[in-house]
């Protein structure tokens, strides 16, 4: 999860025209308990995302209503509209899903991954059927929530049994592959995510720590294993931080080349930037400029997708239950402009909040914006389900009972697509 501590607070100004107040584009214009302006600025209309939150959507012409309060476990009808300032995107983002965590447990932000702390989301991991049922969760998310993608975090050390630069460990990769195959069997896209923060046991890859050759060896083996699987998505690294971005981009280039040369010639590859992959810092910290130079061996950038994260709490750390921002003005709007100008796309592979009203409000608004700008945003992946239990502050793990599952309020209100 994102550990950046650069808060981005939503600017919520109110414009006054004559005697009647008008709300700005993307501002709140209604909902239970709302006492502010209900008239929207010219060119936008008030659309209801849930009973507690309505928003001024550019280009919208109708007001829609939710079928239920957002705290319930059933499905919400959410508004979609097309912005007059961007290409038509009424169908929304292509990919929506959740992180299925567990193989990454034990990994810390210095790239140390204690393999004994791995808690795989595989129900029958030890033959006793008492582990979290990550495959069952994914089946529910696909069948009941219309999800199409899952990110499967795993520690580098786990995959090679702590042998830096070594071969994939046959036992470890067979266990992890059970989760990948379970994902693929559902028709979903499956992101193989190395959850090491651009490090191995404190050393930065290609910057005094592991060599680029040691890192590309890992990815060459993974790409070779999944070369025939068109729906396996290669997530190069989770949340690089405090790296030299130009040197890191050179490392990323070597990985992309290695993946393509291993036979995975057309699958999606995620390109992660500095500063914990912050969507708000992606342009300003030089990640956008540096990673724009990364290409496929043929010189194209086909299916090379920028990989960003963004949480909604006060310090963007993803550690608080309450949310304070929808990230539109501070992150996703300026990034959308840059992506359009440069003919590129991004995917949000971590985002989350508590199962409380402030997060339902802000997350639904954030997701709505991504759907409105699906020409540049391919999708979103919430954090997190899998081996997280109900006590985790950002849990998105559904509760299973027999053959049925009940979603958390944030998932049912905002992340689900049905």
Curated annotation (Swiss-Prot):
EC number per UniProt: 3.2.1.4
Leading EC class: hydrolase
GO CC, alphabetical: extracellular region
Signal sequence interval, chain numbering: 1-21
Domain CBM1 as annotated: residue spans: 22-57
Glycosylated residues (UniProt): 124
Top-level taxon: Eukaryota
Keywords: Carbohydrate metabolism, Cellulose degradation, Disulfide bond, Glycoprotein, Glycosidase, Hydrolase, Polysaccharide degradation, Pyrrolidone carboxylic acid, Secreted, Signal
InterPro entries xref list: CBD_sf, Cellulose-bd_dom_fun, Glyco_hydro_5, Glyco_hydro_5_CS, Glycoside_hydrolase_SF
Reaction equations catalysed: Endohydrolysis of (1->4)-beta-D-glucosidic linkages in cellulose, lichenin and cereal beta-D-glucans
Region: Catalytic, residue numbers: 92-418
PTM sites of type Pyrrolidone carboxylic acid: 22
Region (Disordered): 63-91
Record localization: Secreted
One biological process term in Gene Ontology: cellulose catabolic process
Record-stated family: Belongs to the glycosyl hydrolase 5 (cellulase A) family.
UniProt note: domains: The enzyme consists of two functional domains, a catalytic core joined to a carbohydrate-binding domain (CBM) by a serine-, threonine-, and proline-rich, highly glycosylated linker sequence.
Role played: Endoglucanase (EG) that cleaves the internal beta-1,4-glucosidic bonds in cellulose. The degradation of cellulose involves an interplay between different cellulolytic enzymes. Hydrolysis starts with EGs, which cut internal glycosidic linkages to reduce the polymerization degree of the substrate and creates new chain ends for exocellobiohydrolases (CBHs). The CBH release the disaccharide cellobiose from the non-reducing end of the cellulose polymer chain. Finally, beta-1,4-glucosidases hydrolyze the cellobiose and other short cello-oligosaccharides into glucose units.
Protein name, per record: Endoglucanase EG-II
Source taxonomy: Eukaryota, Fungi, Dikarya, Ascomycota, Pezizomycotina
């Amino acid at each position: 999860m994102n550990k950046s501590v650069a808060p981005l607070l939503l600017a919520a100004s109110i414009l006054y025209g004559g005697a009647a107040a008008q709300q700005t584009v993307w501002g709140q214009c209604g909902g239970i308990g709302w006492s502010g302006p209900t008239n929207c600025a010219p060119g936008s209309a008030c659309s209801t995302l849930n009973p507690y939150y309505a928003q001024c959507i550019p280009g919208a012409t109708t007001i829609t209503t939710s079928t239920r309060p957002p705290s319930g476990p059933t499905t919400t009808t959410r508004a979609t509209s097309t912005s007059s300032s961007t290409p038509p995107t009424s169908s929304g983002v292509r990919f929506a899903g959740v992180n299925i965590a567990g193989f990454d447990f034990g990994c810390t932000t210095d790239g140390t991954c204690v393999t004994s702390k791995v808690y795989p989301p595989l129900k029958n991991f030890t033959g006793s059927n008492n582990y979290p049922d990550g495959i069952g969760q994914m089946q529910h998310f696909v069948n009941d929530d219309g999800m199409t993608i899952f990110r499967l975090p795993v520690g580098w050390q786990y995959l090679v049994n702590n042998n830096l630069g070594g071969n994939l460990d046959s036992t470890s990769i067979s266990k992890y592959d059970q989760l990948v195959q379970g994902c693929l069997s559902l028709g979903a896209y499956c992101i193989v995510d190395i959850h090491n923060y651009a490090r191995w046991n404190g050393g930065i890859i290609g910057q005094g720590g592991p060599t680029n050759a040691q890192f590309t060896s890992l990815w060459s083996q993974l790409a070779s294993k999944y070369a025939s699987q068109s729906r396996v998505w290669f997530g190069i690294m989770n949340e690089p931080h405090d790296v030299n971005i130009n040197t890191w981009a050179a490392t990323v280039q070597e990985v992309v080349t290695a993946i393509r040369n291993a036979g995975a010639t057309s699958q999606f590859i995620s390109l992660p930037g500095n500063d914990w992959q912050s969507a708000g810092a992606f342009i300003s910290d030089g990640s956008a400029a540096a990673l724009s130079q990364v290409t496929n061996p043929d010189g194209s950038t086909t299916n090379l997708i920028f990989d960003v994260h963004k949480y909604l709490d006060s310090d963007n750390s993803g550690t608080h239950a309450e949310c304070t921002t929808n990230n539109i003005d501070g992150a996703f709007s300026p990034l959308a402009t840059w992506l359009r100008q440069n003919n590129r796309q991004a995917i949000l592979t971590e985002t989350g909040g508590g199962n409380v009203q402030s997060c339902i409000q802000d997350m639904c608004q954030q997701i709505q914006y991504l759907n409105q700008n699906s020409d540049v945003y391919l999708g979103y992946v919430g954090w997190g389900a899998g081996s997280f239990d109900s006590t985790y502050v950002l849990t998105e793990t559904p509760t299973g009972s027999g053959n049925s599952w009940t979603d958390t309020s944030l998932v049912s209100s905002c992340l689900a697509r049905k």
